[in-house]
């Protein structure tokens, strides 16, 4: 039931009808707008990554330059990218392999028969893990001058060293902004859910109050949230029961 409808049926004050219906409309429209903004930024940062992160550059920098001296910067690491092969490589090894295959086959990137699958994991990994920092094309400038640098992050009981570049920093900031909008959209969804619960409780309470002088029977209510293990927040819906 749309929040405010129960109040209208019970002939509640207009301010109460407007409050519940207004919260509903504003929350839904705000959530949709924030999701739209998050998606636009996502498209932008993916295009940015497509133009500034390169598989051949990653292999070369990781294996042949000082950036590869860091413990977390190597080809065969904890995390992997999916590679798509074509031509003779695909005939021999199949269409898809993981990026650790390049540890012993770095020459593949020069054959023109291998590309990186730019899926959701790819766009997350290149910004999140030092292992892939060598793929950012601004690790070194035109004069082969070093442009990557260290950033120190306090993680409580220790300090984490992050290897980054100007482009990677920009990319991470864009992803963070997109995620901020998504989090705001989640809050809007929560506002809608709680607005439904409170509106329903108010409607039931108003019904009880209006009927009590006319009937000896008391109407008892039970309002609760339904658990759903497949739901992101564990909430599958709202349960409202009336007993008389």
Enumerate the predicted regions with their spans.
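Alpha-helical transmembrane signal-anchor/signal-peptide segments
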Residues: 37-50
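Short hydrophobic alpha-helical membrane-entry/anchor segments
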Residues: 8-14, 29-40, 198-213
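Solvent-exposed, amphipathic alpha-helical segments
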Residues: 3-4, 174
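Hydrophobic alpha-helical topogenic segments used for membrane insertion/localization
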Residues: 1, 18-32, 188-201
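Outer-membrane beta-barrel proteins
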Residues: 6-9, 242-244
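Extracellular loop and loop/strand-boundary signature of outer-membrane beta-barrel proteins
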Residues: 4-5, 226
């Amino acid at each position: 039931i749309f929040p405010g409808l129960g109040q209208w049926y019970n002939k509640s004050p207009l301010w109460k009808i407007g409050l519940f219906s207004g919260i509903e409309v504003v929350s839904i429209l705000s959530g949709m707008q924030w999701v739209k903004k998050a998606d636009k930024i996502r498209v932008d940062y993916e295009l940015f990554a497509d133009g500034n992160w390169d598989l051949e550059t990653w292999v070369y920098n990781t294996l042949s330059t000082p950036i590869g001296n860091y413990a977390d910067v190597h080809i065969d690491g904890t995390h992997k990218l999916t590679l798509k092969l074509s031509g003779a490589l695909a005939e021999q090894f199949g269409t898809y392999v993981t990026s650790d295959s390049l540890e012993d086959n770095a020459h593949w990137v020069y054959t023109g028969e291998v590309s990186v699958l730019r899926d959701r994991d790819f766009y997350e990994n290149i910004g999140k893990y030092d292992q892939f920092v060598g793929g950012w094309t601004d690790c070194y400038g035109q004069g082969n001058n070093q442009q990557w640098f260290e950033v120190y992050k306090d993680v409580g009981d220790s300090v984490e060293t992050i290897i980054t570049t100007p482009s990677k920093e920009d990319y991470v900031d864009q992803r963070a902004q997109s995620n901020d909008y998504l989090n705001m959209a989640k809050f809007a969804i929560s506002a809608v859910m709680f607005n439904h619960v409170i509106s329903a409780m108010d409607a039931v309470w108003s019904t009880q109050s209006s009927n009590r002088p006319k009937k000896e029977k008391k109407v008892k209510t039970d309002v609760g949230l339904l658990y759903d293990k497949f739901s992101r927040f564990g909430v599958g819906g709202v349960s409202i029961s009336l007993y008389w």
